From Swiss-Prot:
SUPFAM superfamilies listed in its UniProt record: Gated mechanosensitive channel
Organism classification: Bacteria, Pseudomonadati, Pseudomonadota, Betaproteobacteria, Burkholderiales
Subunit structure: Homopentamer.
Claim: Cytoplasm is one of the keywords in the record: no
Protein name: Large-conductance mechanosensitive channel
Provenance organism: Burkholderia multivorans (strain ATCC 17616 / 249)
Length: 143
């Protein structure tokens, strides 16, 4: 069997196609979660913490060059200038993003597994010998 033929069989299998669709939908879904975190959750957390903006929280690890013309309090400006910064605020945002995404995926898997559960099987039919013995018992009771 040639390599091309083997690859073709592999590529058209249901699992590979399902995976491709899942990756595409996951990419689009992660943008939604990013927006929920950045635009909805982080502003609320900022209000609750007194206007704290996590996205711009960092620790300066290097020295700011004398030629730096940006805002020395801006994480993005310092990072763009190549200054070593430890951006823990960005990490907190990504962590919240991950927790939300993991929880939503957990709920989806739980729902799908609930749908996949087979219906309760009907009770097995009583074997003929048991039926016959019951008939004999009932017949003897009537005498």
């Amino acid at each position: 069997m040639s390599i091309i033929k083997e690859f073709k069989e592999f590529a058209v299998k249901g699992n590979v196609m399902d995976l491709a669709v899942g990756v595409i939908i996951g990419g689009a879904f992660s943008k939604i979660v990013d927006s929920v975190v950045k635009d909805l959750i982080m502003p609320v957390i900022g209000v609750l913490t007194g206007g704290l903006d996590f996205s711009n929280k960092f620790v300066l690890l290097g020295t700011v060059p004398a030629s730096f013309k940006g805002n020395p309090d801006s994480f993005k400006d310092l990072q763009a200038a190549g200054v070593a910064v430890f951006g823990y605020g960005s990490f907190i945002t990504v962590l919240i993003n991950f927790i939300i995404l993991a929880f939503i995926i957990f709920l989806m898997v739980k729902f799908i597994n609930k749908l996949r559960k087979p219906a309760e099987a009907a009770p097995a039919a009583t074997p003929e010998d048991i039926v016959l013995l019951r008939e004999i018992r009932d017949s003897l009771k009537q005498r």
